[in-house]
Amino acid sequence: RRYIRKFKKEENFILMDFFCHGVPSMLMWKKYIKEVKKTIGKITYLSWRNKVINCHDMKTMIIDNEKIDWHDSYNLLVKGEKGYYNSRLSQGDVFYRLFLSDTCLGKACYEKCKFKYDRSSADIRIGDLWGRMYKHNEDGVSAAVAFTQRGWELLHECNLEIVEHSFDVVAEGQMKEMPICDELYKRMKILLQRDDLDINQIYRQLLIALKYRKVMNRLKHPVRTMKNILKKIGK
């Protein structure tokens, strides 16, 4: 926005950004692709958030028309010379498990991201509307936030069904702050750089580290831990 404002062109643009969890680190992505290639050979096609699976026609990918639940939008389809590989978070795919652990994001996500949650330089922000409000909606609901009057006017000029909610509802499932660059992140970076470890071995190391962190956190807060135990027993 500062750039177009500098040249007095701001009125010629509508700026849009996205609710963003982060981007996977290149180290993690390369490690994952290396593992996938063992199954399907050289990769020739890749579709992020693929909504349709086809097990038969590798050209169109849509013969079976198996609709993917929008809640399962963490979904990646990779086509290779020997077949295809469908990666879904709901099926426990290691790529998404690592990504959502916030320990394997790109460096800039930890150091330079200024636009989490309600911070933006755009007129409009879009994304998926996660959260309790539409938890049982099977068709999918898009979130659109107008940060400026121009953004608000444009949204209402579009041929859309608009239901207004508070920002807290719209952004309920979104990250509020940058992820923390802690010791676990540094540890994962070292593991991802090792040629002798595949991505599944690295994920197992992460699980061990997370379990250790959970136990230590409980030991550091015995009163809170006991209250939680009693609450579970009470149920």
What is the meaning of each model-derived region?
Residues 41-235:
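Long, compositionally biased charged/polar accessory segments in the mid-to-C-terminal portions
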Residues 17-20, 31, 109-113:
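Functionally engaged cysteine thiol sites
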Residues 2-3:
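Classical protein tyrosine phosphatase
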